[in-house]
A protein has these predicted regions:
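Compact alpha/beta protein-protein interaction domains typified by the UBC
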Residues: 1-10, 24
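Glycine-rich phosphate/adenylate-binding loop
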Residues: 48-192, 314-318, 322-487
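Ser/Thr/Pro-rich, low-complexity mucin-like regions
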Residues: 29-46
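S-adenosyl-L-methionine
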Residues: 290-308
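Short amphipathic alpha-helix with an adjacent loop that forms part of the alpha/beta core around
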Residues: 307-315
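Glycine-rich adenosine-cofactor-binding loop
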Residues: 218-260
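N-terminal charged helix/coil linker that caps or initiates catalytic domains
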Residues: 178-229
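Glycine-rich phosphate-binding loop and adjoining beta1-alpha1-beta2 segment
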Residues: 258-293
């Protein structure tokens, strides 16, 4: 039940109603509210526990309540923190952070810096019930419940007010039976180291801007927070891979690409146009770290060959290679197999136009490598992969500005589908659900390719009706001297 008496009988998740049965809907809602109130009236302990589960919503409805944003961990560790507030402007702004920390996502330039105290209590006293409002009595009751350590922090909070009136903030967390902690607060004035009762108090609540909370609430894996993944090649496909890994919860990314972001890629790259002319890795670091709280990105504006030659792979949990250059990718596949460190490597590339995309997972020291794909039906080495959708020796590149502007035609949809597929394959390897070689692909309808007279392989026709298990066996089924010691 809210401060104003509203009763919530359903959270709305999965609720389906027939809008033509209005009387039945009203009757059902009223009966549900009655049953809920009757239930809590007979069990005071359970009612109190349920109320504390919903404390933040109740507090937010108190008269004069202001909602701020918290960037510190609500971990039950009593401490002095910092508050930044402005209740006089057109829109009230309040932020809370640990001392010495100025979160980059908050604009604090025009806000007053205030002293604040965060404490944790097992029970919250003095909660006002309608029609009563929050008063200084609440602070008195909280103060009476403080431990000796908390009381010392309280005195330290008020100490600067000995010479002038100061605005202070008290934030209190209490346990929720449903898990976690509720956080509420109050802003008040102090003078001569005492609460100034001439200045009204007002309630505070806070949106949680901590990386841990937003990750868990937003569906990002906390298990992946410690994982470190390198993405080699940050073009249209590689940038989608990086963005998807970050959104899934991977906490550390290493981005390697020597090129600048070009206006030619605006419609198929995750970067915004404001980054045109900047190194792609630097721009992605800037954009992704601001997009995904808690993410740490290492950006290398160098060639992948140079990076690999100077960087030990120990400490890296996975690598995604998104060059779209088969010869270069094969050389990297061999380089990874020569390393002592075992790790999963995903190679991903696009076919021209709307034919489809591919993603291959290999492990550095296990059977199955990129060279396995470069075998003909007899098992002999060949120049083109068995997985190709396009027959070899066809001209598919275009250029609009001369030789320097040559590109392979494909669109944003194709790049995103391929990038998501490769990222999903890497995520499976990181969490242990994919522990062996694997080949994944998607097949487009080929309308554009056929309109341009391009010839497709028999595999492109068979692929839609072939399971990924069978496709993986076919892709890696030929003898390979690189990964299995025979030819």
């Amino acid at each position: 039940m809210s401060y104003h008496g509203s009763v919530c009988v359903n959270d709305g998740q999965g609720l389906s109603i027939d809008p033509d049965r209005r009387e039945d809907i009203a009757a059902h809602t009223l009966l549900a509210a009655y049953d809920l109130l009757e239930k809590w009236s007979t069990d005071e302990y359970a009612a109190r526990a349920e109320f504390m589960n919903e404390l933040e919503g109740y507090w937010n409805a108190l008269p004069g309540s202001v909602r701020g944003q918290a960037a510190f961990e609500i971990d039950g560790r009593d401490r002095l923190i910092s508050a930044y507030g402005d209740r006089q402007g057109k829109q009230s702004a309040w932020y809370f952070a640990d001392r010495g920390v100025r979160p980059q996502e908050f604009d604090l330039t025009k806000l007053q810096s205030l002293r604040a105290l965060y404490i944790h209590l097992d029970q919250l006293p003095g909660i006002p019930a309608h029609p009563h409002q929050l008063t200084h009595d609440f602070l008195d009751e909280v103060r009476a419940a403080l431990s000796s350590h908390q009381l010392a922090l309280w005195n330290e909070l008020l100490n600067p007010s000995k010479n002038a009136r100061k605005t202070n903030v008290l934030l209190v967390s209490v346990p929720r039976q449903a898990g976690g902690r509720s956080l509420i607060g109050v802003a008040f004035a102090a003078r001569d180291r005492e609460i100034d009762r001439h200045v009204p108090v007002f309630p505070l609540t806070a949106r949680r801007r901590m990386a841990s909370h937003m990750r868990e609430r937003g569906g990002a894996s906390l298990e992946l927070m410690a994982k470190r993944v390198a993405v080699l090649g940050c073009g249209a496909v590689g940038s989608v891979v990086a963005d998807t890994l970050a959104a899934a919860g991977v906490g550390k990314l290493i981005l390697i690409d020597a090129e600048e972001y070009s206006e030619d890629n605006v419609f198929r790259h995750v970067l915004q146009p404001i980054y045109i002319g900047f190194p792609k890795t630097i721009a992605l670091k800037h954009q992704l770290e601001r997009r995904y709280p808690g993410l740490a990105v290492e950006a290398f504006n160098i060639t992948a060959q140079r990076w690999l030659a100077s960087t030990p792979l120990k400490g890296i949990d996975g690598v995604v290679v998104a060059f779209g250059a088969p010869s270069v990718e094969r050389s990297f596949g061999r380089a990874f197999r020569s390393q002592e460190h075992e790790l999963p490597v995903v190679f991903t590339w696009l076919e021209a136009l709307d034919l489809g995309g591919h993603s291959v997972l290999m492990w550095a020291h296990r059977p199955g490598c990129l060279d396995c794909l470069y075998r003909d039906d007899e098992g002999a080495p060949c120049l083109h992969p068995r997985t190709s959708f396009l027959e070899p020796n066809q001209h598919v590149t275009r250029n609009l500005t001369g030789c320097a502007g040559v590109f392979v035609p494909y669109g944003a949809l194709q790049a995103r589908k391929t990038g998501h597929m490769a990222a999903e394959q890497m995520l499976g390897a990181l969490v242990g659900s994919s522990t062996a070689r694997a080949y994944r692909y998607w097949v487009g309808d080929g309308t554009q390719a056929q309109a341009q007279g391009l010839r497709t392989t028999p595999w492109w026709s068979r692929a839609p009706s072939t399971s990924t298990t069978v496709a993986t066996d076919q892709a890696f089924g030929r003898p390979c001297k690189r990964c299995r010691g025979n030819s």
